[in-house]
Amino acid sequence: MAKKEEIKAARFEGYLPTGHRYNEYHEKTGARRVTEILLDKLYNRPYKTEVPLRGFEQVLPAAKVENLADTTIALFTTGGLVPVGNPDKLKQAFSVNYGKYSIEGLDELKKGVYESIHGGYDTTDASNDPHRLIPLDVMRDLEAEGKIKSVFDYFYTTCGVGTNVETSKEMGRKLAEDLKKSGVSAAIFTST
């Protein structure tokens, strides 16, 4: 810095990484570089990733569901399925909250009544068939066959693209609290 020289990334300069990412010029395209890294990994050759993974805390899995026939199951998606018009104005990306919508008495989710507002994928197929995100039709079949006790009367939805970890954890805490209070002991979580 004192010499007013360009400061390069930590992997070149040897300082502790700060988490900042910089645009860099490379002779090879990203596709070529990642293919070379993948081949090195597959052939057990030494390699260095360009984007190291952050360490995340370990989350213990939920207890095993012993008897599905006595279980109320909730449905949740990060695919952004909402009633047409997005009445709660959920964000298409970088979500800070989630929606909770009644499915009480419904056997299916109809095209034109629900739509996906997710900003990270082509939502055409999900909007044309909402069961791709919330499989209510199949769950009602399982309920009618006695294979599960019931489907929870609401489904939950948000858009998972770009949501930060702390916000996700807070939403998860609120959801878990709501589900426990409602007697729900299992959930099906779909993602895109």
Regions found by a protein language model. Give the residues of each.
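An N-terminal assembly and electron-transfer interface module characteristic of large anaerobic redox
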Residues: 1-192
